[in-house]
Swiss-Prot record:
<comment type="subunit">
    <text>Associates with the 50S ribosomal subunit.</text>
</comment>
<comment type="similarity">
    <text>Belongs to the TRAFAC class TrmE-Era-EngA-EngB-Septin-like GTPase superfamily. EngA (Der) GTPase family.</text>
</comment>
<feature type="binding site">
    <location>
        <begin position="209"/>
        <end position="216"/>
    </location>
    <ligand>
        <name>GTP 2</name>
    </ligand>
</feature>
<dbReference type="Pfam" id="PF14714">
    <property type="entry name" value="KH_dom-like"/>
</dbReference>
<dbReference type="InterPro" id="IPR006073">
    <property type="entry name" value="GTP-bd"/>
</dbReference>
<dbReference type="Pfam" id="PF01926">
    <property type="entry name" value="MMR_HSR1"/>
</dbReference>
<dbReference type="InterPro" id="IPR032859">
    <property type="entry name" value="KH_dom-like"/>
</dbReference>
<protein>
    <recommendedName>
        <fullName>GTPase Der</fullName>
    </recommendedName>
</protein>
<dbReference type="InterPro" id="IPR005225">
    <property type="entry name" value="Small_GTP-bd"/>
</dbReference>
<keyword id="KW-0677">Repeat</keyword>
<feature type="binding site">
    <location>
        <begin position="321"/>
        <end position="324"/>
    </location>
    <ligand>
        <name>GTP 2</name>
    </ligand>
</feature>
<feature type="domain" description="EngA-type G 1">
    <location>
        <begin position="3"/>
        <end position="166"/>
    </location>
</feature>
<feature type="binding site">
    <location>
        <begin position="9"/>
        <end position="16"/>
    </location>
    <ligand>
        <name>GTP 1</name>
    </ligand>
</feature>
<dbReference type="InterPro" id="IPR015946">
    <property type="entry name" value="KH_dom-like_a/b"/>
</dbReference>
<dbReference type="GO" id="GO:0043022">
    <property type="term" value="F:ribosome binding"/>
</dbReference>
<dbReference type="GO" id="GO:0042254">
    <property type="term" value="P:ribosome biogenesis"/>
</dbReference>
<keyword id="KW-0547">Nucleotide-binding</keyword>
Amino acid sequence: MVPVVALVGRPNVGKSTLFNRLTRTRDALVADFPGLTRDRKYGRAEVEGREFICIDTGGIDGTEDGVETRMAEQSLLAIEEADVVLFMVDARAGLMPADEAIAKHLRSREKPTFLVANKTDGLDPDQAVVDFYSLGLGEIYPIAASHGRGVLSLLEHVLLPWMDDVAPQEEVDEDAEYWAQFEVEQNGEEAPEDDFDPQSLPIKLAIVGRPNVGKSTLTNRILGEERVVVYDMPGTTRDSIYIPMERDEREYVLIDTAGVRKRGKITDAVEKFSVIKTLQAIEDANVVLLVIDAREGISDQDLSLLGFILNSGRSLVIVVNKWDGLSQEVKEQVKETLDFRLGFIDFARVHFISALHGSGVGNLFESVREAYDSSTRRVSTAMLTRIMTMAVEDHQPPLVRGRRVKLKYAHAGGYNPPIVVIHGNQVKDLPDSYKRYLMNYFRKSLEVMGTPIRIQFKEGENPYANKRNTLTPTQMRKRKRLMKHIKKSK
């Protein structure tokens, strides 16, 4: 499971600046959920190939009423949901009562916490952090987030060792095995008996959506009708439950972000929305079922979730729930709204269901299998190059500075989502419109459905770049004669 790192501290200690450094963004709006996470922002970050989710919390005022009552509710939730906390203090302002109150609260939670002293630029770091040792949180890590100083050291000496301890990399790298086997097939070598086959693995299926759209009802409907072997496998400390199941002789692992509950116990008060559980489920899944309430339509929260799914490259099936009981006129209006607001993801299947009564639920798995098969299918270099050539013949690349962009060949670069790597000259100058044309052409030719497809471009190396031609003695004499002739003609 992807680790979660929360940044907490008083207002204006530099949390958002560090957040932007870690997520490599400027506006910190990587996966923002308006109305639910007013003062929490979420982003995907990476250090040496290890991914983690970073939370930027709102400032904590630490008034005399105490942290427990005055701390922003969203910041409290962020601390509870995080695996590790980076507690930030302002080295310029020095130790404040609010810092002591926050430290007391963090100690009571017994959460792994690292103390980070920001704004140490222009100061003696050792002298600036002395007072903060009284907080009793161990070693202090001085940084200057605005200039990036000390941030890399913080990642390498704090976060990386911590992630290696609590979330070691899996011994089996599915992607590496997949492409190793692909290379064996490309070279015509005989495959070993224990080949990696994506079809032999269970499909990890996450059901996500806003509160009260029917996620738990759909989960229980699926398990109630098709339960074969079900037992709870806690995946993390956060209540996400992995439920093995089988349907039509195909194994699945259902990632339930709301927890498995008896139908009678599902109430509005109980089914609370957890952003972190949802983001982790999306990251860990092969296919995501995005559940939308037909009666409420598509909200900004739905679009934010959708954006995170697309950025993660996960396969997608859209489920419009509570379809029963709507008049034909309302149904037509809902479909028009879907076409208008979701027209940019025409690759995803849309299902209209009633999780409560079970209508349409059985058809979901056909789309889930289709999306998974599309995202894990191996395609040869010859096939991809042939499709690229056909696309170029149908619509030539544009001219750049009087020369036509040349695409040479294409090959596979990854799966889940499928990645096509195209090599050529001047590809960096290709306009976005032509890149979209190529993406749609590959999607149509490969009949990819249910999964985004990504195209990466690589520039061909110029063997003469940064090289100067050395003239031979004969060429030098010829050049001198030519220069004399030019001077005389003047």
